[in-house]
């Protein structure tokens, strides 16, 4: 095995260890991973420009059927509210309910506590470097998976 291949194997191993840890330790307790992604988008979205299910699907790379299934479950649990546009009745907006905001804030706080421990261990400079490298790695993977996509589409 070449040095390059060994480095790639080590990267794969580190990636797998992190993935197994995250899945095995259920860091998210009240929401699924996809629900956290959707809640995070809705939480940060200005209230005067609500999102549609289609927009959420585009941002998460989930299929329309997956988004609808997730949103229906979230609505059943009173985490989101759907409202029809007054301008176009075909358009339905999705917003977090108060319960959704509370639940998301609780999940977010738990994840932030873990990231605070990483930040404390690495220090600010290395944490900034890690963040930049993770973003760059995500971009590389996105471009590898879809070489025709622009970085704006990602």
Predicted regions and their residues:
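Basic amphipathic alpha-helical segments that dock to polyanions
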Residues: 39, 56, 71-77
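N-terminal helix-turn-helix DNA-binding core of bacterial DNA-binding proteins
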Residues: 20-66
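N-terminal positioning helix adjacent to the helix-turn-helix/winged-helix DNA-binding module
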Residues: 7, 34-38, 52, 99, ...
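Alpha-helical macromolecular-interaction surfaces
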Residues: 13, 69-70, 132
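Charged, amphipathic alpha-helical coiled-coil/dimerization segments
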Residues: 72-129
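N-terminal leader segment of winged-helix/HTH proteins
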Residues: 1-29, 33, 40, 77
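Terminal interaction helix/tail motif
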Residues: 9, 109-154
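Short glycine/proline-centered loop/turn elements that form peptide/ligand docking sites
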Residues: 31-32, 66-69, 73-76, 148-151
């Amino acid at each position: 095995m070449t040095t390059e291949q060994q480095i790639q194997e080590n990267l794969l191993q580190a990636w797998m260890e992190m993935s197994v840890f995250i899945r095995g330790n259920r860091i998210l307790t009240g929401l699924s991973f996809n629900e956290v992604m959707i809640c995070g988008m809705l939480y940060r979205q200005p209230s005067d420009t609500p999102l549609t299910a289609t927009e959420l699907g585009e941002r998460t790379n989930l299929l329309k059927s997956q988004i609808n299934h997730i949103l229906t479950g979230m609505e059943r649990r009173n985490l989101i509210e759907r409202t029809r546009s007054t301008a176009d009745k075909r358009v339905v907006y999705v917003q977090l309910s108060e319960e959704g905001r509370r639940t998301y804030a609780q999940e977010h706080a738990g994840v932030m506590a873990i990231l605070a421990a990483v930040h404390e261990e690495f220090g600010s400079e290395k944490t900034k470097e890690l963040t930049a490298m993770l973003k760059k790695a995500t971009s590389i993977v996105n471009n590898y998976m879809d070489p025709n996509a622009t970085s704006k589409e990602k």
